[in-house]
C-alpha cells in the first residue's frame, strides 16, 4: 500500500518506466526479509493513507529513499509526523538518517528541520567524445 501511494504520486512528478516500480517492489521485498528495509505510513482516522515512505538500511545509515504525500497529508503535516516517528523508533541506535539530499531548496529546508546538514559528494564525469569534440565541450 505504501509503495502504491508512492507510485501514484510519482506519476505526477517523475518520468519513470512502468517496470521501475515492479523492480523496486521486488528489491524492497528482498531487503525487507533481510531486515534492511521498512516502510512507514500515516493514516487518517478513517484509515486513508496520507503519507508514506520507504527506508533502506546500509552501513549504519537509514536512507529516506521514497516518499509520497496525498494532498491531504501535506496540509496535515503528515510527512513531519512520519519522519518524527521514524526518528523516535530508532533513537539511541548507531544509525544516521540520510535524506539523500535535494537540489530543491524547500525540501532541503524541510530536512534541516530534523537536523539534516549538507553533505558534499564527489563525482567524476567522463567525456567519451572523439578528440576534436572533446576539446570543444568543456
Q: Regions from the language model: what does each represent?
A:
Residues 74-88:
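Conserved acetyl-CoA-binding loop-helix of GNAT-fold acetyltransferases
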Residues 91-138:
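Active-site/acyl-donor-binding loops of N-acyltransferases
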Residues 27-30, 85-89:
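A generic secondary-structure signal
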Residues 1-74:
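A conserved beta-strand-loop-helix scaffold within acyl/acetyltransferase catalytic domains
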Residues 32-35, 90-94:
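A structural signal for short coil/turn segments at secondary-structure junctions
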